[in-house]
Structures are given as structure tokens and as C-alpha cells.
Regions:
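Alpha-helical transmembrane segments of integral membrane proteins
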Residues: 135-354
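Gly/Trp-centered helix-boundary motif
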Residues: 1-165, 169, 313-323, 327-334, ...
Length: 354
């Protein structure tokens, strides 16, 4: 009996020792530190919510984003049916007109208009709609257009980031590993590209090739790979003479296998951080182009085009500017919080900071 108890205690001690000495991977360590960063977690959950909204936008119970109804133009945000909002607007306008003309009763024409509107509200199902965030100049639902606008903006940011990563990571890895004249030629090309006016090139491409969502993210991505190319090149140069690379080389591994199988996986941390920090830059670039009238074409909408439309009537209809601007600002802040958290999580120097 005593022997069994000692054996059990010994096994328990061995298990506890194994748990303590169990190696922790980079990803486990990064996730552990990320969970301790409250702002990064808020950013992660917020970004996740936005992406889910963008992915499942067609399944959401919102009105079609392109549907127009001119009887409902410029309705303010409200929980009431559109007919009630329309009627209250007309009453408020008529009351101001009566005060200006110093009269206390409706005219016959005004009574007839009110009766016609009330009959229309009772019979027309469109007046039973609820526009929680109001409508625009064509009677389109602002909530629906903000959701679908986010879908376009996030897609442009995501596709632009993926394209920039593909070009920048590939060229940076090849330049860093090959060295010599290949490295010099590629880096001189990067230096030349850095000297060119980035936004001017994008504007010229959009003006020549037309307003197309595919052209838009390609135009942005083709100029945005320069930074990640330099970062990856520096990482590859610092790693290419490591022992694990020498071991792979001695076993006959090709240069391509060493780059993509051994070196790039060790740079994934910095690549992920770059992705989360560059995506807001793509969205801001798209918004700037939309503000200049070079964004997506109607009836499509992005956050940038919605903000551009909202600026035109911001004094009379402030919700047309504030709602898409707030939606975009929250997403950009969330991406930056997440990017900062990931940077701290993957940075070994930040272990004692979290």
C-alpha cells in the first residue's frame, strides 16, 4: 500500500515537472501575452465583429443598399416607422411656416396634403419601414449602405494587403537570401519606387484605367509592398546564417525550400504585425480617393464615398457624415489596437512589459 502511494506521488511529480518544462511555441507565447492586453483584445473582438458583418451582410435583415424611394429622402435616424417620421417632419415644417405668416390654422391646401399623406401612410407598406440610421438624398437606407460600404472598404484593405504581402515578402526574401547583385538591384528598385509620389501614381492609374474596384486595390497594392520588402529582407539577412539554415543546406535543401520552408516561417510574426498595421492605411487611401471622386462607382459604396457624400450636406443632414465616419474610425482604431498588441506579443523584448 505504501509502495503504491509513493509510486502515485512520484508519477504526479513527474507529470507536474513535465508540465513546467513543456516547451512553449512562439504562437502559444504570443497568444498568452495578447490575452493580457485588454486594448488588443477589444481590437480583436471589434475587428472580428466587423468582418462577420461584412461576410454575412446579404443575410442581415436590412434593406437593399441600392434601393431608392424618393418619398423618403433625408429622413433622420429614428425608431419610428418612416410614415410617422415623414408626417412629423411635414407638421414641423408647416408649424414654422404658420409662425412666419402669423396664422393659427391650416389652409385648405395644407389640410388636403395632410389627409392625402395620412391615407398614403395607411395604404403604402413602404411607409412602415424603419430607418434606424436615416436615409440619404435618394431615400436609401444609411444603415444598409454603411454595412455594405464597410464590406467594400474592408475587402479593398484585405485584398490590397494580401497583394502587397505577396509581392513584398517574395522580393524581400529573395533579395535577402541571394545577396550580391540581386540584392543590390532589387533594393535600388525599391529606393527608386520610394522616391516616386505614391498617391499621385495611384490617382493617375485610376484616372487612366477607370473607376473599378479591382483596379482600385491593385493600384494601391502595387505601390504599397515596398516597406514589407525591406523588413523581410532584413529579417532574412539576420537568419540566413543560422544553424538551422546551415543544417538544411548540408542536407541538400534547395534555396527555394530554405527560403519558404525554413526562413519565412520565422518571419511570420513581423508579417502578421505589418498586415494589421497596413490594412488601415489601405482603407484610408481608398477613402481619400473616394473623397476625390476616384473611388468605387455607384451604386456601390464604401466608407470613403459615404463620407464624401455626407460632407456635401453636413450642416443640414449631419447623420450622413457622422455615421460612416464613426463606423470607419472605430474599425481603424480597432485595427491599430490589435496591431500594437500583436507587435508587443511577438516582440521578445516586451515580455516584461505585459
Amino acid at each position: 500500500m505504501l509502495f503504491k502511494a509513493r509510486k502515485k506521488n512520484a508519477e504526479q511529480a513527474v507529470n507536474e515537472f513535465n508540465q513546467v518544462m513543456k516547451p512553449v511555441s512562439l504562437w502559444d507565447d504570443a497568444w498568452k501575452r495578447l490575452r493580457k492586453n485588454k486594448m488588443a483584445l477589444i481590437g480583436l473582438y471589434t475587428v472580428g465583429f466587423y468582418i462577420l458583418m461584412a461576410l454575412f451582410a446579404p443575410l442581415l435583415p436590412v434593406y437593399p443598399y441600392e434601393e431608392q424611394y424618393l418619398a423618403h429622402i433625408y429622413l433622420p435616424p429614428s425608431f419610428k416607422p418612416a410614415g410617422e417620421v415623414l408626417l412629423s417632419q411635414k407638421r414641423a415644417y408647416t408649424a414654422k411656416l404658420m409662425a412666419k405668416e402669423k396664422r393659427s390654422e391650416y389652409t385648405e391646401q395644407e389640410r388636403a396634403e395632410f389627409e392625402a399623406l395620412e391615407r398614403d401612410i395607411q395604404t403604402n407598406p413602404m411607409h412602415k419601414r424603419h430607418y434606424l440610421l436615416g436615409t440619404d438624398s435618394l431615400g436609401r437606407d444609411v444603415l444598409s449602405r454603411t454595412i455594405y460600404g464597410g464590406r467594400i472598404s474592408i475587402a479593398i484593405g484585405l485584398l490590397g494587403t494580401v497583394t502587397a504581402l505577396f509581392i513584398g515578402v517574395t522580393l524581400g526574401a529573395v533579395a535577402g537570401y541571394a545577396g550580391g547583385w540581386i540584392d543590390s538591384a532589387l533594393m535600388r528598385f525599391v529606393d527608386i519606387m520610394y522616391g516616386l509620389p505614391y498617391m499621385l501614381i495611384v490617382i493617375i492609374m485610376m484616372a487612366i484605367l477607370g473607376r473599378n474596384i479591382f483596379i482600385l486595390f491593385i493600384a494601391i497594392a502595387l505601390i504599397s509592398w515596398l516597406t514589407i520588402a525591406r523588413v523581410v529582407r532584413g529579417q532574412i539577412i539576420s537568419l540566413k546564417n543560422s544553424e538551422f539554415v546551415e543544417a538544411a543546406r548540408s542536407m541538400g535543401a534547395s534555396s527555394g525550400r530554405i527560403i519558404f520552408k525554413h526562413l519565412l516561417p520565422n518571419t511570420l510574426g513581423i508579417i502578421i504585425v505589418y498586415s494589421t498595421l497596413s490594412m488601415p492605411s489601405f482603407i484610408m487611401s481608398e477613402s481619400f480617393l473616394s473623397f476625390l471622386g476616384l473611388g468605387v462607382s455607384a451604386p456601390l459604396a464604401s466608407w470613403g464615398s459615404l463620407v464624401s457624400d455626407g460632407v456635401k450636406g453636413m450642416e443640414l443632414y449631419p447623420w450622413l457624415l457622422l455615421i460612416p465616419a464613426i463606423a470607419m474610425t472605430v474599425f481603424l482604431f480597432a485595427m491599430n489596437f490589435l496591431g500594437d498588441g500583436l507587435r508587443d506579443s511577438f516582440d521578445p523584448q516586451s515580455k516584461n512589459k505585459v
